Amino acid sequence: MNDVITAEFDENGRAIRRIRSFVRRQGRLTKGQQLALDEYWPLMGVEFTPEALDLPTLFGREAPVVLEIGFGMGASLVAMAQQHPERDFLGIEVHSPGVGACLSSAHEAGVNNLRVMCHDAVEVLERMIPDASLDMVQLFFPDPWHKARHHKRRIVQSAFAGRIRGKLKISGVFHMATDWENYAEHMLEVMNHAPGYRNLSDDNTYVPRPDSRPVTKFELRGQRLGHGNWDLMFERVE
């Protein structure tokens, strides 16, 4: 696998430092995760390149495409791929242990409608995802960066909302979920002011958790800690 970020330099050759929504940490791979990377990455892994993907070629068919950003260990992503064989799923995660775990689960489940990447999702969106190509984008339980001085690291910002809109088809949906109330409020504020979207909530706030979203590890952890859960769904309308 390539590095999770691409080095960028200005005209004077100085490295450009982007504000990123994640901290780079490799983590230790279990034997099973390493085996999955060795065995199944060639089948389901997608390397980062600065060229747009041909999604029908990638999956070998024309089908609705769901992009999930930050799939963690991949359990819910694999479950959705199992439940919806009529859709194709592309998952992005920056931490290789999670990618290995997802590949292992996908192989055990026998799914063939799932591909994964190990790279910065913002770079993937900028370089590899064609405009108006996605039926849904999922962002479940991203890092809330709860300290005020770190709020600039939150992935849901105005520019990000605009980038997602450009990649969604008309009527495509951006589905977010968080167990951090302040982040939910931040997401709602950003998205309600983002042009070209319609909030699918009846009262212009949050939607009930749809049955289509499996309960994630982070959601269960939040429930044990007494946290609530907030789902937001916004449709691209223009």
From Swiss-Prot:
Substrate binds at K147, D179, T216, K217, F218, E219. S-adenosyl-L-methionine binds at E68, E93, D120, D143. One of its GO terms (cellular component) is tRNA methyltransferase complex. The keyword Methyltransferase applies. It is an enzyme of class 2 (transferase). Pathway: tRNA modification; N(7)-methylguanine-tRNA biosynthesis. GO terms for molecular function: tRNA (guanine(46)-N7)-methyltransferase activity. Its EC number is 2.1.1.33. Keywords: Methyltransferase, S-adenosyl-L-methionine, Transferase, tRNA processing. InterPro entries: SAM-dependent_MTases_sf (IPR029063), tRNA_(Gua-N-7)_MeTrfase_Trmb (IPR003358), tRNA_methyltr_TrmB_bact (IPR055361). The active site is at D143. Gene3D superfamilies: Vaccinia Virus protein VP39 (3.40.50.150). It holds the Pfam family Methyltransf_4. It catalyses: guanosine(46) in tRNA + S-adenosyl-L-methionine = N(7)-methylguanosine(46) in tRNA + S-adenosyl-L-homocysteine. Monomer. Catalyzes the formation of N(7)-methylguanine at position 46 (m7G46) in tRNA. NCBIfam families: tRNA (guanosine(46)-N7)-methyltransferase TrmB (TIGR00091). PANTHER family: 3-DEOXY-D-MANNO-OCTULOSONIC-ACID TRANSFERASE/TRNA GUANINE-N 7 - -METHYLTRANSFERASE, PENTACOTRIPEPTIDE-REPEAT REGION OF PRORP DOMAIN-CONTAINING PROTEIN. HAMAP family: tRNA_methyltr_TrmB. Belongs to the class I-like SAM-binding methyltransferase superfamily. TrmB family. This is tRNA (guanine-N(7)-)-methyltransferase. It comes from Edwardsiella ictaluri (strain 93-146). The gene is trmB.
